Amino acid sequence: MSKSLLWDDLEYPIQPWIRSAVDVMGFENMTPVQAATIPLFARNKDVVVDSVTGSGKTVSFVIPIFEKIVQEEANTTKMKKGHFHSLIVSPTKELAKQIHSVFESFLEHYPENLYPIRSQLLVGTNVKTVRDDVSDFMENKPQILIGTPGRILDFLKIPSVKTSMCSMVILDEADRLLDVSFLKDMENIMNILPKQRRTGLFSATITSAGDNIFKTGLRNPVKVTVNSKSQAPSSLKIDCAVVETDKKLEQVISIINNYKFKKCIAYFPTCHSVTYFYSFMQYLLKKGIIKEEIQIYSLHGKLQTSARIKTLETFTETISNAVLLTTDVAARGIDIPDVDLVLQLDPPTDPEVFLHRCGRTGRANKLGKAITFLTPGREEDYIPFMEVKNINLEEISLDIVNLPDNFYEIFKDWLLEDRARLDQAVKSYVAYIKTYSKHAASSIFRLQSFDYVGLAKFYGLIRLPKMPEITKYFKEDKENARTFGEGWLIDPPINMDKFGYLDKKKEDRRLADLKNLKSIHDKKKLKSELKKKNMSWSNNTQSKEEKVERRTKMALKRKRIEEELSKEADENSSGDDEQNRDWKQVILQNKKSKNSNNGMQGSFDDL
């Protein structure tokens, strides 16, 4: 790109306070995407921006929005009550909050003597309702709204909220907003907003949105693409390692114990997995198996909004040796400073998310490393699969260092302390398999070649759960069926009736349920025995006599038929053995003849 990256070389002079803000925030020069996008958007062009993660896309729309608001205020285009100027939509609460914080960071440098510019965050929480958001909106009169699709749609439906003065709309991580999860809400939002507006779509993987981008009301958009041989920034090194399924957790712990990093994000496949492994890793911290200076946090979509925001803030503020266990809720757009290591225990089910996960490190030209685990065999085909998408994975070899040889025994002992941990492990196991079965690259990630036993050990399970996939697996794999036929992974098996919960209320409820089930079982067994016991002697004798009588009658009938057939054969015999007929064949022919007559009778009756 031939454009100058100096702020002073922009086609128009930006506001002095904005220039001051970018200097204080450390943006010495523009990134290529900023140099291309800011002038276009400021000149009232719709834009579709496709650029690698960490390339500064957020600032590309923040500055033009501020410029337009200041310009319109200078032209005495005052914002009426209940109206707003700009709307920014993001797929997650965490990303929305981050964008809001960027706007607020710029506003810290806004002159107090000018007309006030304000922004408001619109995300669903367990504290604030939509009515609360509307009340704040009417009182504070913000020009800029940032939020998630569901909350924004509910907000815009309130009659006191007016949309006719909205002149700029941004879809950050647009490909995610335009997929099936959010498309309906986004269409409804776009229908509420005025047609005469500027629209900007921003993402590192915008091409995956396909024709859905035309549903956003774009008018003669300009596409901004920062040319690169790879989809990943040059500061990001993407590696992969072949790791046995049951060794993945040990490998993660080995890496965070021995690798020098400030912040690490470890991606797990499901919310259940994050919760489960967070508990176990806290236990390993206390045991000294994970180094004491390491701080571990958990974040996933099923946490309450307040807990998610607090966790993200704490992780962001931590200086070093911080590890965040998370799901794809933290895969897109979130810019956490000093993340220099990303671990993926499995590739994401959607290949488009792969680069977003890796892109949490190596941002703003800072060096970063991302490592993805692949299991031996078919999953190794993921490397050439990603090469087609211009993402090069370099295969590396990893060793498990300074961990106890009896790691699985430690895991098992921890699990056996509380039945609630087993429940969580089973939920995590089942959720993992369901997620794995939905992988977009289904030719690579196949349940037919899946390591069910290895996954069970990965979760520290003592017994394989009962589920259709495992039943089918054992039918096809006779060797494992013999080894794990009863599902037990430990020897000797434990008495599940005596395996209880640490929580007294849960345990009391379990014992009551167990007693009830035992009572039902005993009643059924007793009923069956009483039925046999109470059957009269005369009935038993009569039943036996009837059986003998039936057998006698059948024997006499068979003998009579044989005699008749023998007599018929003697009368019609021509001396040729081939014409002698077996009496069984005669009976069969008689039956066929009888059936044929019955069929004929039926057809006549239908006339």
Swiss-Prot record:
Pfam family, one: CTE_SPB4
Subcellular location: Nucleus, Nucleolus
Motif DEAD box: chain residues: 172-175
Catalytic activity: ATP + H2O = ADP + phosphate + H(+)
Keyword Transcription: no
Task of the protein: ATP-binding RNA helicase involved in the biogenesis of 60S ribosomal subunits. Binds 90S pre-ribosomal particles and dissociates from pre-60S ribosomal particles after processing of 27SB pre-rRNA. Required for the normal formation of 18S rRNA through the processing of pre-rRNAs at sites A0, A1 and A2, and the normal formation of 25S and 5.8S rRNAs through the processing of pre-rRNAs at sites C1 and C2.
This protein's name: ATP-dependent rRNA helicase SPB4
Extent of motif Q motif: 7-35
Any coiled-coil regions, as ranges: 529-565
GO biological process, one term: assembly of large subunit precursor of preribosome
Domain of life: Eukaryota
Keyword annotations: ATP-binding, Coiled coil, Helicase, Hydrolase, Nucleotide-binding, Nucleus, Ribosome biogenesis, RNA-binding, rRNA processing
Ranges of Polar residues composition bias in the record: 587-601
Any one GO MF annotation of this record: RNA helicase activity
Family: Belongs to the DEAD box helicase family. DDX55/SPB4 subfamily.
Organism of provenance: Vanderwaltozyma polyspora (strain ATCC 22028 / DSM 70294 / BCRC 21397 / CBS 2163 / NBRC 10782 / NRRL Y-8283 / UCD 57-17)
UniProt: ATP binding residues: 51-58
Classification via InterPro entries: CTT_SPB4 (IPR056330), DEAD/DEAH_box_helicase_dom (IPR011545), Helicase_ATP-bd (IPR014001), Helicase_C-like (IPR001650), P-loop_NTPase (IPR027417), RNA-helicase_DEAD-box_CS (IPR000629), RNA_helicase_DEAD_Q_motif (IPR014014), SPB4-like_CTE (IPR025313)
Domain remarks in the Swiss-Prot or TrEMBL record: The Q motif is unique to and characteristic of the DEAD box family of RNA helicases and controls ATP binding and hydrolysis.
Record-listed E.C. numbers: 3.6.4.13
SMART domains recorded: DEXDc (SM00487), DUF4217 (SM01178), HELICc (SM00490)
Renumbered residue ranges of the record's region Disordered: 527-607
UniProt cross-references to CDD domains, sorted A to Z: DEADc_DDX55, SF2_C_DEAD
Subunit field text: Component of pre-60S ribosomal complexes.
Domain Helicase ATP-binding: start-end pairs: 38-224
